[in-house]
Amino acid sequence: MAAEKMALAKAINESLRRALESDPKVLIMGEDVGKLGGVFRVTDGLQKDFGEDRVIDTPLAESGIVGTAIGLALRGYRPVVEIQFDGFVFPAYDQIVTQLAKMHARSLGKVKMPVVIRIPYGGGIGAVEHHSESPEALFAHVAGLKVVSPSNSADAYWMMQQAIQSDDPVIYFEPKRRYWDKAEVDREAIPGPLHAARVVREGTDLTLAAYGPMVKLCQEVADAAAEEGRSLEVVDLRSISPVDFDTVQASVEKTRRLVVVHEAPVFLGSGAEIAARITERCFYHLEAPVLRVGGYHAPYPPARLEEEYLPDLDRVLDAVDRSLAY
């Protein structure tokens, strides 16, 4: 089948459909995922085609949803859980941290936990608090979890396939503001490893590293910088835990500068760990300190202040200017 251009949300839908078709043990669970097709219609049509026993509408109880998924995984199923919005995941945090993430190690490797938790996250859609947060660092800190975030339709499709096939739990963060961005998806492609980062734009003067919704912004920054004669490399991290530090290191050894960009607050965000590791690995290559651009260390603001809170072209370009000034 030839490649098809589709929105990121549609790519996830098609990937879930493929998984349901190929493995009767795959189940989808969550609030309004069935009859409604999800708040963002990511699961649209799946309950109609596969039935209520495989695409399951649940009560509004995130802890119960994840706990049920853990039980199903113990019985050999591969549940895919949808948390309706990023800020709704916290009632399930206990189940995720104390049970889901630890079951494999607790059993000395005998018990597998093939559970995927889908979390639409981030801002940019004018929503209120609890609907626009970026809690990925809270999960990346937990050993036993894989944490990923696609930035485009092709990765959304294939990373979902790989997440469902994983015998370890995967937290799959979906960038809401990119749901309707379209790109080519080749259903017959051979994807790289789930954890592998990718250089999506080559450059020589500075590296921008990002994941999920900020990759597109970094590409726009690189376009703007090119108009001033600056050559920026953009690395799509794809995986937040584990991080493909080797790819980032190779880029930084070439460009000698790094700016990490994410929507989550800069304080103790994923960028802090990346900055620390790259400083340790590339100390003698760096021409400037590693800089970070992210949200502020404050509760997510009302929608009318969202644009002031989130990283934008000017804030990232300012970091680029500061780095290149050294």
How would you label these PLM feature ranges?
Residues 1-173, 308, ...:
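Thiamine diphosphate
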